[in-house]
Amino acid sequence: MKFTLSWLKDHLETDATLDEIVEKLTDIGLEVESVDDRAAFRAFTIARVLTATRHPDADKLQVLSVDTGDGKPVQVVCGAPNARAGLVGVLGRPGDYVPGLDVTLSVGKIRGVESFGMMCSERELELSDEHNGIIDLAENAPVGTSFAAYMGLDDPIIEIGLTPNRADCTGIRGIARDLAAAGLGTLKNTLPDAVKGEGETPVKVILDQDAGNPFCTGFALRMVKGVKNGPSPKWMQQRLKAIGLRPINALVDITNYVTFDQGRPLHVFDAAKVKGNLTVRTARDGETILALDQREYKLNAGMYVIADENGPESIAGIMGGEHSGCDENTVDVLIESALWDPRMIARTGRELGIVTDARYRFERGVDPEMMVPGAEIATKLVLELCGGQPTVLDVVGYKPHTARVIDFPVTEVKRLTGLDVSYEDAFDILKRLGFGVEGDGKTIRATVPSWRGDVEGKADLVEEVMRIHGINRIDPQPLPSHGAVNGRILTTLQIRTRHARRMLASRGMMEAVTYSFISEAQAKAFGGGKPELKLANPIAADMSDMRPSLLPGLLAAAQRNADRGFGDIALFEVSGIYEGDTPDKQRRVAGGVRRGTAKVEGAGRFWAGNAAPVGVFDAKADALAALEAAGAPVDRIQIEAGGPEWLHPGRSGTLKLGPKVVLGTFGEFHPDTLEALDVSGALCGFEVYLDAIPEPKAKSARTKPALSLSLFQSLKRDYAFVVDAAVEAGNVVKAVSSADKKLIVGVQVFDIFTGASLGEGKKSIAVEVLLQPQDRTLTDEDLEALSKQIVASVAKQTGGVLRG
C-alpha cells in the first residue's frame, strides 16, 4: 500500500516529521517497507535558456546563457540536440548531486569554455529512460522555483506492508485513523455532505440472486448528466503517478483516487453505452467480456457480472468492460458503489487470473457503511472536475450493518501479553480507534466499528490495545536460571527427523521442500484422493488434495531438474503426509528418489566404466540407512518382496518389524505410475515411517558407549544351502545370524544358483559368515560346533540343507 505524505495529511492533522511518522507506523503494526523522500530533486531549479550559440571548438556543443530567476544569467555548456533559446528546462548547479549519473556537479571547462551547471534530461534525474534531449517544460513554468515542487516530486512516498486482516488500511484514511489513535495527530472529518440530486436515476438496478445467500449485499447507482470528461487535474495525476497508477481521464481517475483514499472501490459506466437496466446476476457458461485491460475473458456459471441487454458490462467487483468504459466523449456517467461477497471475488479473480486494486480490497472485506458515502465522495469530485447534474442516488439491496459487541475484561491484556495497561488507557485507545465503548471500571463493552471486520473477540481487542499502547513498552525480563542443566528439549520424533535428515544428506542426496498440496490425479496414483483430504479453497487447480505420500512431489522435482539438464539427481524430504483429516492421521515420513545414475558412490561416467542406472537396491540401502539413523532396530527388520501399487511388483519391497508394524517401502517405480505423472527415466524411491519406529524398551543413554574392540583376529567361513525356490535369501541370512548372536557379527549373500543338479524347485544360496571371537582364539572344535549350530538353525527355520 503506497501513499504520499501530503495525501496522508489530507486526513491527519499533524506536525510530526516524516521520520516520526515512519517509526510510528512500524510501531503500530503497519510495517514500512520503503520510503522515497526524493530529496535528490530538491536542489534543481527551473531555468530558461536566453541564448544558445555554437561552441567555438565543438560542432555538437552549444554555449547557453540561462536565466535562473535572480537576474544573473548562468553560462552552461550543453550537447543536447533540443537545446535552444526560449526552452524552459531544469538546471543543476555546482554542488548538486545528479542521481542518474551518480556525480556531484562542479564548475568545469569543456573544450576550453567554462560551464557553471548542467541542463538535465529525464534519465539523468531518473524520471524515465528518455535521454535524447534535455527536459522541455511548458513555457509558463515559473523560472527560478523548485523543479521538484513544480512537478510534485517533493512529496515523500511511503509504502507499507499490510497483513490480510487489515482491510481498513487499504485506504489512506484508515492509516491516518491508526496514527491519530497512536497520538501522532488528529483525524480530520473529510466526509462530505450528501449530494442533493434531481430526479430519479433512469437506469435501474435488478439483483438477480438467491435471497438466502446473496453475493451482492448492496448496490448504489447514480447518474451525473452533462459531464465534460478530460484529463484529471495536476494534483490528482501527481498523486496517482506517485503510487504507480497511470492517469487515464478525470472520471476513471476519480474512481482510482477514491479507492486508495477511502479503501472504497468504485466503477463508472458511460450511460450512453448501457442498453436498458443493469442486472446483477451469475454469468452464463460461455459468455465472454472484453475487459478494460483489453483482454477477453471466458466466463462460467460460478462467476458474477453486471449486465445490460447487450450482455456483461463488468466482472462484478473486479474489472469493468471495455464496451461501457468512459472516454473523452462521455456525456452522462453512471457511478456504481456496491458490496460483494469476498469469497466470490477471490474465487472469480483466481479463476480468471485477474489481480486488480478492487479485487484486493473486496476479497479482504470493505467497510459496508462506506458504500453510500463512497458514492457521494465520487459524485462530489465529478461535479467539481467535470461538472454536470446528478440524479438521486438509487440504493438497492442494502441492509444497515449490525455491529458486533464484545465484553472485554481489561485484565486480558496482562494475561495474554504481560503488558500492564490501565482501564482508562485501554478505554481511551479503543475509543480513539473508533470503537464504541462503555464500561464499569473493569470490563469494557466494546462495539466494533464497521470498518474492522477482523475484530471478532477479546484477543483481537488485546492486540489493538497492545499495538497502540506500544509493544516496545513491555519491560524485558531475563529467563530464570535454576542452576541446572536443561533436560532433553527435542521430542523423540524431532530427534528421529533430525538424524534421518543428516543421514540422507550424508548419502549424497539433496533436501527438497515440496508442497503439501498435489493434484487429484497424483493423490489417487499414490493411494490418496479421499474426499476428506480435498481442499475447500485450493490455491490452484492442480493443488486440490493433501498429499498421501512425499513421492509425487519428489518425482515432479526430479523431472523438473531433468528437463533442465540435471538428470542424475537424488532428492529427499522429511515431512508430513496425510492419511485422514484428524491429527492422528498425519504421519512423519522420510522419503527420497534417485534418478539416472545418481548412486551413493557417484553418478555419470568414470574411467573404469559408466555408472549403472539406479535400482531397487539403491532405494533399499537408503531406506535402511534412514531407519538405522532414526533408531530403528535394523537387525530385526524383515524385508518382504513387493510393495504398494505405485512400485514395480517385482522390484520393490516392504520393511516390517513383526507381522503388523510397517516401517517403510522401497523399490523402482511402476511404469504406469511414471506415465500417469508424466515422468521418465530410471527412477527408484523409498518412504520410511519415522513415527512407526517403536520406542526402545530401555532408556537410551545421552552419550555413545565406549568403543569395544576385540584383541583376537576375525575369520570368515562360507556355507551353501539348498533350499526351496520360494525361500527368500533374507530368511537364510536371519537363520544363520541367530545361530550364535555373540560370535556371528556379519552375514553376506555372495551367490545364488539354480540348476538341474539341485533338483526341481530348488536353489542354492551361498553366504559368507564373519566371526569375531571376544575372549579367545577359536579352535577347530569351536568352529565345528558352530557349523553344526548354523546348519541346524537353517534347517529348522527354512528347511534347507548344507550343499554337498
Curated annotation (Swiss-Prot):
GO terms for molecular function: ATP binding; magnesium ion binding; phenylalanine-tRNA ligase activity; tRNA binding. One of its GO terms (biological process) is phenylalanyl-tRNA aminoacylation. Gene3D superfamilies: 3.30.56.10, Bira Bifunctional Protein, Domain 2, Ferrodoxin-fold anticodon-binding domain, Nucleic acid-binding proteins, Phenylalanyl-trna Synthetase, Chain B, domain 3. Its cofactor is Mg(2+). Residues 710-803 form the FDX-ACB domain. It catalyses: tRNA(Phe) + L-phenylalanine + ATP = L-phenylalanyl-tRNA(Phe) + AMP + diphosphate + H(+). InterPro entries: aa-tRNA-synth_II/BPL/LPL (IPR045864), B3/B4_tRNA-bd (IPR005146), DNA-bd_dom_put_sf (IPR009061), Fdx_antiC-bd (IPR005121), Fdx_antiC-bd_sf (IPR036690), NA-bd_OB-fold (IPR012340), Phe-tRNA-ligase_IIc_bsu (IPR045060), Phe-tRNA-ligase_IIc_bsu_bact (IPR004532). Residues 401-476 form the B5 domain. Binds 2 magnesium ions per tetramer. It holds the Pfam family tRNA_synthFbeta. The keyword Cell cycle does not apply. The keyword Protein biosynthesis applies. Keywords: Aminoacyl-tRNA synthetase, ATP-binding, Cytoplasm, Ligase, Magnesium, Metal-binding, Nucleotide-binding, Protein biosynthesis, RNA-binding, tRNA-binding. Mg(2+) binds at D454, D460, E463, E464. It comes from the Bacteria. Residues 38-148 form the tRNA-binding domain. Tetramer of two alpha and two beta subunits. Belongs to the phenylalanyl-tRNA synthetase beta subunit family. Type 1 subfamily. This is Phenylalanine--tRNA ligase beta subunit.
